[in-house]
Amino acid sequence: MEIEKNYRMNSLFEFYGPLLTDKQHAYLALYYGDDYSLGEIATEFNVSRQAVYDNIRRTEASLEEYEKKLHLFANYQAQNEAVDTLVSYARTHYPDDKALSTLLERVADQTAK
C-alpha cells in the first residue's frame, strides 16, 4: 500500500508541483523524492517534526484536490493504456507493417513524455 501511495504522490507532484508554494514543494521533494524522514526535514528547515507532518498532509490533500478537479494524472494514465492497447493490437494483427510500427513508436514516445 505504501508503494502505491508513494507512486501516486510522486506522480501528482510531477503534474501539480508548479502549483505548490516553495515550502510545500521543498517538503514534498525531500519527503517523497529524496526519502527524507520528517525529522530530517524538520532539522533542515528548523521547524518541528509536527509542522512538517502537518504541511505534508495538507499538501497531499491539495494534490488530491487538484487531481479531483483537473484529472491530468487520470487522463495521462488512460492515454497511456489506450496507446499500449493500440500498439499490442497492431503488433499482433499487423506484425509486418513497418510504417504502422514506426508511427506507433512515435505516438508511444510522445505519450511517454
Curated annotation (Swiss-Prot):
Domain of life the protein comes from: Bacteria
Give the InterPro entries listed for this entry: RNA_pol_sigma_r3/r4-like (IPR013324), UPF0122 (IPR007394), UPF0122_fam_protein (IPR054831), WH-like_DNA-bd_sf (IPR036388)
Query: Which Gene3D superfamilies does the record associate with it?
Result: Winged helix-like DNA-binding domain superfamily/Winged helix DNA-binding domain (1.10.10.10)
Q: Which Pfam families match?
A: UPF0122
Annotated PANTHER family: UPF0122 PROTEIN CBO2450/CLC_2298 (PTHR40083), UPF0122 PROTEIN YLXM (PTHR40083:SF1)
What function is annotated for this protein?
Answer: Might take part in the signal recognition particle (SRP) pathway. This is inferred from the conservation of its genetic proximity to ftsY/ffh. May be a regulatory protein.
Similarity field = Belongs to the UPF0122 family.
Q: What is this protein called?
A: UPF0122 protein LSEI_1603
Q: Please name the source species.
A: Lacticaseibacillus paracasei (strain ATCC 334 / BCRC 17002 / CCUG 31169 / CIP 107868 / KCTC 3260 / NRRL B-441)
